[in-house]
Amino acid sequence: MGPLNGINLFLPQMLEHGEASHIVNTSSFSGIHGHGNQSAYGSSKFALVGMSEFLRNDLKDTNVSVSVLCPHVVDTNIISKLKARVSADVLKMINQMAVDPSTVGDQVLKAIIEKEFYIFCDGVHTREMLKARCDAMLSAMDRQFPEEEND
């Protein structure tokens, strides 16, 4: 796993020099919210988000901070390659959700400066999916522990 190799290589040096440092791991929104037909890809992205969360906790009292980038749809050449594989309606939806790569760069820079952990690039579509996932998890907890419900 590339990010783990990079961390193993550079983290000791970052800690040793003592200056403020920051690690940004690039995951995907698929590492936060599962999508259809992405079991292998999504699992690797979930693992990267989890590793980043643990790393952030491990480094909380050091000079190194951590972020995880979770873009959903970015307007890159990947989208143009989808044309042959998806319907026109799906492609239209993807294009409507796509954010400009410079927006992603701006979000990453802002997160580094503000030491923000989760970096999202779209506050509309991803917010809806994230809310649905969190609501489903909380609903399951409420069903399993009804006597402990907190309104």
Feature annotation, model-predicted:
Residues L4, Y41, V49:
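Catalytic tyrosine of NAD(P)H-dependent dehydrogenase/reductases that use a Tyr as the general acid/base
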Residues I7, S44:
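Active-site helix of classical SDR
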Residues H33-S39:
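Active-site loop immediately N-terminal to the catalytic Tyr-X3-Lys motif
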Residues N57-G123:
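SDR active-site lid
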Residues L138-D151:
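Non-catalytic terminal and boundary segments that flank Rossmann-like NAD(P)-dependent oxidoreductase
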